[in-house]
Amino acid sequence: MSNRPIAVVTGGAGFIGSHMVDLLLEKGFSVRVIDNLTGGRESNLAHLKDNPDLTLDTRDIRVLEPDDSLVADAENVYHFAGIGDIVPSIEQPTEYMSANVMGTVCVLECARHAGVRKFVYAASSS
């Protein structure tokens, strides 16, 4: 078991998230990624496949319970998971609301329950 501080990155297999994963590992964090690979790609993390300080969980953020072990003991959460693209959001508003709003609520509840010190939320303008 590592003594490194723990960071959670939602959407960590996406373009922005995977770069955050690289930076956090470089800065000495143990990183737990949750990404259902709907928009992200495992290939974005392929160069890290043998890194013992990286964990990839392919669940949807909407299934996280407040006491989920993924977030337990984490110091920081970087939340990048969500569905982008404007046109499909107009055609499928319920799915977008569920993934983007309720998914964020699930991640926030986990962070609150775990006593996370820093929560960073980022979203694209799409």
Please provide the spans of the model-predicted regions:
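N-terminal Rossmann-like NAD(P)+-binding domain of SDR-like oxidoreductases, especially those catalyzing
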Residues: 1-126
